């Protein structure tokens, strides 16, 4: 929770940096409370430690048990701290979505796990020495004038590429160009990424501002999720696309190249709200990385005309001011690479699809709707997607 009398439950107190006033958020209450469940956990660990001499046969075994117990305590405390940070960082995503309108777009970026080339029929020897095909996913979210949220996905496929800031900036430029063509009224952009080095570096942070100015849009924010902070929009969309490709493979086709992968994604009418680009990124001759000491500790950035305002935890304190004058913007712009669209596609139409809220039905509601009957009709069973189970066997698309 944002405010609590328990010290490590209060986000303002736990995530503030007492050594830096820029990252310090004041609380209006005293932290003199205690959590009964947290105390129970600590008490249980103490009881385990007290019982170790009773179960250890030798001193070496006792030392090993003590070490394992101490490691378990540290892991539990680290996990608890991670949950607090993850909730706080997710607040940035929620607030950005609430601010969206029909002139702004929220972009979530991530590299999907490489796809291994596969044949419809392949021998065991064909399985070895494969090189995965890299692909990048960008999910764009906007809010229509009637307050309905819409999303679309940009997929960039590569034969081979380095997953570095140079490639990411090329993808950013391509996405902004396509969005500006399809949405002439676009004026604001928000970014959210994970903590991969290709995103969480000075070159990407500063280069994104240069690209936005070049595209004629205003870059408002860039936020980073907490490491291992659950699945995001890109992971969910990647799972849908992989399932679609599996159907194409089961139909007797091969997926061994980036071009065949594009054909698989676009087969059978394609995946709703997904546009695919067969891409190539030219190698730069010079790679002068932008230097910014301590950038890996910054998780939230707000772009202003004269400066950057940065935080190490979302909304904790007024933030630290970083002037644009410390970066050499002309040099950065000269070194930016552009994505080469191998099929030279520039669609004016952006396939945005409406986002439908998920509704969860409790067990009690389900039981009451059945009217106490043990046997429902076949039509009732088929009408609920929550009662469908997919076959776990690879290659099977049956549901039960």
Stretches with model-predicted labels:
Residues 1-398:
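Extended mixed-charge, aromatic/glycine-enriched low-complexity segments
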